[in-house]
């Protein structure tokens, strides 16, 4: 894996509040190597460690994006949901930002059919076929579409299990992490001071409650993915 410079600035991270952890009494001792100090009962995250792991994660996704790998971004709590969607759309990634449905990955043989169903129903609606349905059936179709869009809209183009999953909050997305562990899918995850860094392949020590912190970390990762896509396209055009 080639190391690159990703312009990860400690001052920028401080302004975003990346360094603020949880109350010291709520900590996970496994986060000790990533904690700088305790201030007024709050753990302060060591941002030099954050920068190191974030840079490592950026290198990984850059290389993987250049090989056409898939990266769903997962973050369903309200502080993360909007940032997850905007970052994923920017980098042409899949995303889940409303609710992680149990078995979304471990039961992919079923989950994978739902986006296809969504596209079929959407086509019916767009072509006006639903207008010929009885009123009750048309209303049912509309409800189905709304539900599928809400929970699966971000993965409607995902045709196979992902290669790497980016997770905005370990505690909130424990089911997703468990499924990735079961299937051996690598994860990149923001870990606050109450998390277990051993549950993820690349833990990024960071405040997982502040919108600015989540947005900054996700933007660095998705910028690296975009650069990986661009580098790959540039390489292909030079060959032809």
From Swiss-Prot:
Subcellular location: Plastid, Chloroplast
Entries under InterPro entries matching the protein: Ribosomal_uS2, Ribosomal_uS2_bac/mit/plastid, Ribosomal_uS2_CS, Ribosomal_uS2_flav_dom_sf
Coiled coil: none
GO function terms (MF aspect): structural constituent of ribosome
GO terms, biological process: translation
UniProt keywords, alphabetically: Chloroplast, Plastid, Ribonucleoprotein, Ribosomal protein
Protein name (Swiss-Prot/TrEMBL): Small ribosomal subunit protein uS2c
Family the UniProt entry places it in: Belongs to the universal ribosomal protein uS2 family.
Keyword hit for Iron: no
Keyword Plastid carried by entry: yes
NCBIfam families per the UniProt record, alphabetical: rpsB_bact (TIGR01011)
Organism: Cycas taitungensis
GO CC list: chloroplast; mitochondrial small ribosomal subunit
HAMAP family per the UniProt record, alphabetical: Ribosomal_uS2_B
